[in-house]
From Swiss-Prot:
Polar residues bias locations: 385-394
Binding sites annotated in the UniProt record for substrate: 22, 134, 348
Residues with the N6-(pyridoxal phosphate)lysine modification: 235
Entry keywords, A to Z: Biotin biosynthesis, Pyridoxal phosphate, Transferase
Region annotated Disordered, chain positions: 383-403
Cofactor: pyridoxal 5'-phosphate
Family note: Belongs to the class-II pyridoxal-phosphate-dependent aminotransferase family. BioF subfamily.
Enzyme Commission designation: 2.3.1.47
Gene: bioF
Protein name: 8-amino-7-oxononanoate synthase
Superkingdom to which the source organism belongs: Bacteria
Catalytic activity: 6-carboxyhexanoyl-[ACP] + L-alanine + H(+) = (8S)-8-amino-7-oxononanoate + holo-[ACP] + CO2
UniProt KW Cytoplasm keyword: no
Length: 403
């Protein structure tokens, strides 16, 4: 059997034997609070559309205006003919809102993170990353010529011990962690990077739009200004794409050397128009963040004290189960009550820390939150009665060790 065919077959067999096979599901209306699968309706608690913009008629109209003005696509990379007034306007809005000199646009957060690390890091550099950073950051760090070390999750003492050995490093953390919903201690991390003459880059994919004054994100909430800020448009913005916010000089550097930017077709200008409108909606429609806070408090009130419940100050509400099969079983039980929650398993999270990743949006109602919590409590009780009790206590220990 040819090498690649054999390798592919072996990897697929191994993944199936582990019970970790992933599959695409065709869903309708999945950008709203109610999705449809195979003719059945479910309350959607798996979306990253935190502010409920993805299917908002105001934002849809803005994109249609952009389509009428600019047509369907950009037709070229930014440095050829793909950079329009709509792109420039979006960059300017982001800079004025978030307090940076330059914004460089990308087609995804994954490509923005990879472009950042690949273009900045050289052979003798040191990269220090939080152990729970996104796969895009970890992969870029491992493939870069720099020496990468990981510090324990949100552990500033461990970070300082590494910085004391390797000053003038690039420190990278997320603002809000996508699988745990917790926040980085940004003020302390910023202080350490200043102390050890290092740079700080923050990926705020899950904080922008949700935290801070007028939704300006995790760094604004922590009252810090990192050297580099990555924001993505696929969560609170309700769209897709990303931007790197930085100084004018770093922006010039990325324009020359960030290959994901230089050699990719620019996002459609109509999308940039819609993103500019999303910026305005995020900053002016405070009721969306207030609604999220209200729903988060209701969820915590119902689940507080239940084993597996993890309290967070963000829309991401992980419920820790432990074993992968138990997490899948409870997720399926929830579907029988018309509640759609995704079970997250290895390799996305460490073995033994499988969880339900519950996400709240401003489009949910209090009644839907109560249906979620009632259904989850019933599913856990049935799981315990059937003898397949989730290994919640052991999973906490495994998670602690993994960090």
């Amino acid at each position: 059997m040819p090498l690649f065919k054999s390798r592919i077959k072996s990897a697929l067999v191994h993944r199936r034997e582990q019970g970790l096979t992933r599959q695409l599901k065709v869903l309708e209306n999945s950008n709203g609070p109610l999705l449809t699968s195979e003719g059945s309706s479910f309350i959607n608690f798996s979306s990253n559309d935190y502010l409920g913009l993805a299917n908002d008629s105001e934002l849809v109209d803005a994109w249609q205006v952009g389509l009428s003005q600019y047509g369907a696509g950009s037709a070229a990379s930014p440095l050829v003919t793909g950079f329009s007034p709509a792109h420039r306007n979006l960059e300017t809005q982001l800079c004025e809102w978030l307090g940076f000199e330059r914004a460089i646009l990308f087609n995804s957060g994954f490509s923005a993170n990879q472009a950042l690390l690949f273009s900045l890091l050289e052979k003798d550099d040191f990269l220090l990353q939080d152990k729970l950073n996104h796969a895009s950051l970890m992969e870029a760090g491992m493939l870069s010529p720099a020496t990468m070390k990981r510090f324990k999750h949100n552990d500033t003492q461990h970070l300082e011990s590494l910085l004391s050995q390797t000053p003038q490093s690039l420190v990278v953390t997320e603002g809000v962690f996508s699988m745990d919903g917790d926040q980085a201690p940004l003020r302390q991390i910023s202080s350490l990077t200043n102390q050890y003459d290092s740079w700080l880059a923050v990926d705020d994919a899950h904080g922008i739009g949700v935290l801070g004054d007028n939704g300006a994100g995790s760094c604004n909430a922590a009252q810090i200004s990192p050297d580099i800020l990555v924001v993505t448009f696929g969560k609170a913005f309700g769209l897709s794409g990303a931007a790197i916010l930085c100084s004018s000089e770093v922006g010039d550097y990325l324009t020359q050397f960030a290959r994901h930017h230089v050699y990719s077709t620019a996002m459609p200008p109509s999308q940039a128009v819609a993103l500019s409108h999303a910026c305005q909606m995020i900053q002016t429609q405070e009721w969306r963040r207030e609604k999220l806070t209200e729903l988060g408090a209701l969820y915590a009130e119902q689940m507080n004290g239940v084993k597996g419940f993890i309290d967070t100050q963000t829309p991401i509400k992980p419920f820790l189960i432990g074993e992968a099969q138990a997490a899948l079983s409870i997720a399926e039980e929830l579907k029988r009550n018309q509640v759609w929650v995704t079970a997250i398993r290895s390799p996305t999270v460490p073995i033994g820390t499988a969880r339900l990743r519950i996400t709240l949006t401003a489009n949910h109602s209090q009644e839907q939150i109560l249906q979620l919590t009632d259904s989850l409590l019933q599913a856990i009780e049935r799981s315990n009665d059937s003898g397949s009790k989730p290994s919640i206590e052991s999973s906490f220990e495994l998670k602690k060790e993994a960090q």
